[in-house]
Design a protein with these regions (language model features):
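A short, basic N-terminal segment
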Residues: 1-47, 196
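Pre-Walker A (pre-P-loop) alpha-helix and adjacent loop at the N terminus of AAA/AAA+ ATPase modules
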Residues: 37-63
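Short glycine-rich substrate-engagement loop in P-loop NTPases that contacts/grips substrate
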Residues: 46-49, 85-122, 139-142
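Residue-level preference for the first positions of well-ordered beta-strands
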Residues: 60-64, 90-91, 125, 162-164
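P-loop NTPase Walker A phosphate-binding motif
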Residues: 74-89
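Walker B catalytic acidic pair
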Residues: 129-131
């Protein structure tokens, strides 16, 4: 009939998956931190694993896990991000301390600031690791709180965007720092608000 047709081969979805993984920033951790490698020996670890796997089956919502360092928060959140990547979602990985410093440094450069923060505001899935972490356990600055609120509020206003948080602070402490921000996280997380060791 004079027309040419093309059809994707099966390998294209695998290629897209690899590209999404590279773009997410999780490539180095993706192989080590999966559900299959999470050691769930105790009842609380089993509960966390179950909640994380259930979260991946949901179509919307947020996930928050807080608690002491070394408890497996990054592992379980990376496993969630991995699973969502495999489901075809676009994931971005943010190490709070690094990206917050970069964004605050751009605050006086409106154009660059808007371009950079938009990446975090609009990512289909955003994983924020070490949320509001500071040096030596100090309280976050007003600049940190304002930056976090700007990102969270933009994401809160778009139900299609999913957010995964890990941090050493519990949600109750986040609420004390900024009630508007904490209440948005609390509401969007629903049943996926987990804490370790409090």
């Amino acid at each position: 009939d004079g027309y040419e047709y093309t059809m994707e081969c099966e390998c294209m979805e695998k290629r897209r998956g690899k590209w999404r993984l590279q773009k997410s920033g999780l490539q180095d951790m993706a192989e080590r931190y999966r559900f299959e490698t999470y050691e769930a020996k105790t009842s609380w670890q089993k509960s966390i694993l179950t909640a994380a796997e259930c979260f991946c089956e949901e179509r919307e919502g947020w996930f928050y896990i807080g608690g002491q360092a070394g408890a497996g928060k990054t592992h379980i959140c990376t496993a969630i991000a991995n699973r969502l990547l495999l489901q075809g979602k676009g994931v971005r990985y943010m190490i709070w301390t690094e990206e917050a410093t970069k964004l605050k440094a751009l605050k006086t450069d409106d154009e660059n600031y808007a371009r950079e923060i938009d990446k975090w505001k609009t990512a289909e899935v955003l994983y924020i690791d070490d949320f509001l972490k500071t040096r030596n356990g100090a309280l976050p600055t007003d600049g940190d709180i304002n930056l976090a609120f700007e990102i969270i509020n933009a994401r809160y206003n778009n139900r299609a965007l999913r957010t995964i948080f890990s941090g050493e602070r519990g949600l109750n402490e986040i609420m004390e720092l900024d009630e508007a921000m904490g209440s948005r996280i609390y509401q969007r997380c629903g049943k996926y608000k987990l804490k370790i060791g409090w």
